[in-house]
């Protein structure tokens, strides 16, 4: 069975760069982010870098905990090698000017989703050989 490295926040920035770096090493990837079209673009770039790497695209808004749990259920059908828990965003500026709903979404993504995915990965893979 193929083993995959999961990269969240893979549509741009550090996440996309990380996915490409693993592709250069011949790894199979599951790339996750909200923006499906950017993930598809990334899949195309990776195909040029490493044609033998299998890249699975999973669009998902991880700021919603029900999506995080559904995603993990979906990922159970794959053998995972590593989780790069990179999804997140910031809202900069004077705290008194922050939009409260945006702040809640940021905490849900940066803290809640990260904690849930990390916990589930450790729970399900702590006794498995991932190499």
Write out the residue ranges for each language-model feature:
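Active-site loop of short-chain dehydrogenase/reductase
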Residues: 3, 79-80, 125-131
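Conserved glycine-rich Rossmann-like NAD(P)H-binding loop of the short-chain dehydrogenase/reductase
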Residues: 25-42
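The beta1-alpha1 cofactor-binding region of Rossmann-like NAD(H)/NADP(H)-dependent oxidoreductases
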Residues: 59-70, 100
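Hydrophobic positions on the long internal alpha-helix
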Residues: 84, 117-121
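Conserved NAD(P)H cofactor-binding loop of Rossmann-fold oxidoreductase domains
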Residues: 86-91
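Substrate-binding pocket helix/loop in short-chain dehydrogenase/reductase
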Residues: 94-95, 99-107
């Amino acid at each position: 069975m193929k083993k995959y490295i999961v990269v969240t926040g893979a549509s741009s920035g550090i996440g996309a760069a990380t996915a490409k770096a693993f592709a250069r090493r011949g790894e199979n990837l599951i790339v996750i982010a909200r923006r499906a079209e950017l993930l598809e673009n990334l899949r195309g770039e990776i195909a040029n870098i490493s044609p033998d790497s299998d890249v699975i695209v999973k669009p998902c808004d991880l700021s919603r905990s029900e999506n995080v749990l559904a995603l993990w259920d979906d990922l159970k059908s794959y053998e995972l090698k590593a989780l790069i828990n990179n999804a997140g965003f910031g809202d900069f500026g004077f705290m008194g000017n922050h939009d409260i709903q945006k702040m809640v979404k940021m905490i849900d993504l940066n803290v809640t989703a990260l904690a849930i995915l990390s916990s589930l990965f450790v729970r399900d893979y702590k006794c498995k050989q991932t190499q």
